[in-house]
């Protein structure tokens, strides 16, 4: 039977590094910052709330006051308002992406 020879330069199981995968060593602080900035999360939450409140609110406000009980027109207005909120979110997201690209270009020019 073959036996394994212990090499002095090889680390034993107790001497191995504390790194497991991509986690930091025992003495280091881990980076707990979120991958997505807080302002992006807040914008998403605001538009999610708007996507729920604005169409439903516009339906119930207009069904009896403006359209005199005609729920078809009030429903159509609610659908239009949902699309308005969606388009507004896309525009805000595109503008935010463009400003990030401009900041990256300015950062490269300064170097």
UniProtKB/Swiss-Prot annotation:
Where is the motif named Prevents secretion from ER mapped on this chain?
Answer: 108-111
InterPro entries per record = Vma21
Does the keyword field hold Transmembrane helix? yes
**Superkingdom of the source?**
Eukaryota
Positions in the Lumenal compartment: 61-73
- Biological process GO terms, please? vacuolar proton-transporting V-type ATPase complex assembly
First-listed, main subcellular location of the protein, grouped into a coarse class? endoplasmic reticulum
Q: Where in the cell is it found?
A: Endoplasmic reticulum membrane; Endoplasmic reticulum-Golgi intermediate compartment membrane; Cytoplasmic vesicle, COPII-coated vesicle membrane
What keywords are annotated for this sequence in UniProt?
Cytoplasmic vesicle, Endoplasmic reticulum, Membrane, Transmembrane, Transmembrane helix
Q: Which Pfam families match?
A: VMA21
Tell me the residue ranges located in the Cytoplasmic compartment per UniProt. Answer: 1-39, 95-111
Bilayer disposition of the protein: Multi-pass membrane protein
Gene Ontology CC, one term? endoplasmic reticulum-Golgi intermediate compartment membrane
Where, by residue number, does the polypeptide cross the bilayer? 40-60, 74-94
Family recorded in the similarity comment:
Belongs to the VMA21 family.
General function of this protein: Required for the assembly of the V0 complex of the vacuolar ATPase (V-ATPase) in the endoplasmic reticulum.
This protein's name: Vacuolar ATPase assembly integral membrane protein VMA21
Q: Which organism is it from?
A: Pyricularia oryzae (strain 70-15 / ATCC MYA-4617 / FGSC 8958) (Rice blast fungus)
Q: What lineage is this protein's organism placed in?
A: Eukaryota, Fungi, Dikarya, Ascomycota, Pezizomycotina
């Amino acid at each position: 039977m073959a036996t394994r020879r212990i090499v002095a330069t090889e680390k034993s199981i107790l001497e191995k590094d504390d790194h497991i995968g991509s986690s930091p060593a025992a003495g280091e602080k881990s980076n707990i910052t979120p991958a997505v900035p807080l302002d992006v999360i807040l914008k998403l939450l605001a538009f999610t709330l708007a996507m729920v409140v604005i169409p439903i609110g516009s339906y119930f406000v207009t069904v009896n006051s403006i359209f005199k009980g005609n729920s078809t027109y009030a429903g159509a207005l609610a659908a239009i308002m949902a699309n308005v909120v969606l388009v507004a979110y896309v525009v805000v997201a595109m503008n935010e992406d463009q400003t990030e690209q401009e900041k990256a270009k300015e950062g490269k020019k300064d170097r």
